Amino acid sequence: MKSLLSNLKISVPDKIFLKDPESSDLGKRIIKHSILLIDDIGFDSFTFKKLGLLISSNESSIYRYFESKHKLLLYLTSWYWAWIEYQLVFETFNMPDTEKQLSKTIEIVTRSIKEDFSFSHINEVKLNQIIINEYSKSYLTKEVDSENKEGYFVIYKRLISRIRDMILKINPNYKYASSLASTIVEGALHQHFLKDHFKSITDCNEDLTPTDFFKDLVFNAIKS
């Protein structure tokens, strides 16, 4: 799987960027160091000026790739969900058992992230922390409906649709497949956040993981 993934290009909706950052060394440095900087200081404090100083490049050169830091965040979140989707597809492709396929999918979507060295300019562990802490800022905006129409969230929605379809294969009569699928994806981020910051209001910890919780939740729901 790793060798196969290394030959694949993660595709992000092209309306999100002005110039594909994967097309140049500068673009890849923008992505690499934006992840490190946002993880370090948070998205609210992040600016293109600070990023430019970090990569020794003019602020204006960053604007050639992204028109705003919001678009950069959309790029990073889209890349992340596409990366998760690739793992889901390749790790479940040869699984004829639908329950095992869904169980593996829940594991992929909810597990703690390890760095994937197939993409040398992207630290997936730090990117995962950005998704946990900052993802909601990519869509909790006044422009969410227009951006949705432009296809900015197509990868995220496609991932949830894949999970929904797996749920329906197991129980075609389950009425809440889309709601459950989106709860797995969003809820996993929330449980990881609670595990790190509000330990008293989650049962998830080092021994009982979000993966354990969501497997229990999902299979009890669809088999009841």
Q: Regions from the language model: what does each represent?
A:
Residues 1-11, 124-129, 134-140:
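Intrinsic, short, N-terminal disordered tails of RNA polymerase sigma-factor systems
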